[in-house]
Amino acid sequence: MLTGSVNVVLTDSDVDVEASFMSDFSIEYTDITYIELRNDLDYGKRVIGAANSKVLTGTFNNDEFGKYRLAVNKSVPECVVIHTADEVYVVNCDNSESTVRMYNELLTKITP
């Protein structure tokens, strides 16, 4: 199945994530403790959500984070890991260049 999409938008106050097969969510910049740009992440197993040949979306569980929210395009190796005090989110854009650009822009929004 080749359906699904992930859309990440950086607003003035938060990260908005719209992804197929899951509820949209937002992460306020003030809640973010740190972020990482990764290309070696083991996504683990799906708890609830979708896993097809195009996207992985929903709640997943892995050894590194335990239960976390995931919204990624499978064809893009880079992803941004967003840590808050209570949760971990992993997202990416539709290509590597856009994902790196989003990471760099997000860094400027969370750094005082």
At which residue positions do the language-model features occur?
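Alpha-helical transmembrane spans
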Residues: 1-6
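Juxtamembrane extracytosolic/periplasmic "stalk" immediately C-terminal to the first targeting helix
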Residues: 9-16
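Structural motif detector for alpha-helix initiation sites
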Residues: 12, 29-30
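Non-transmembrane, membrane-adjacent beta-strand/coil modules in membrane-associated proteins
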Residues: 19-27, 33-85
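Terminal and domain-flanking low-complexity segments
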Residues: 36-38, 74-112
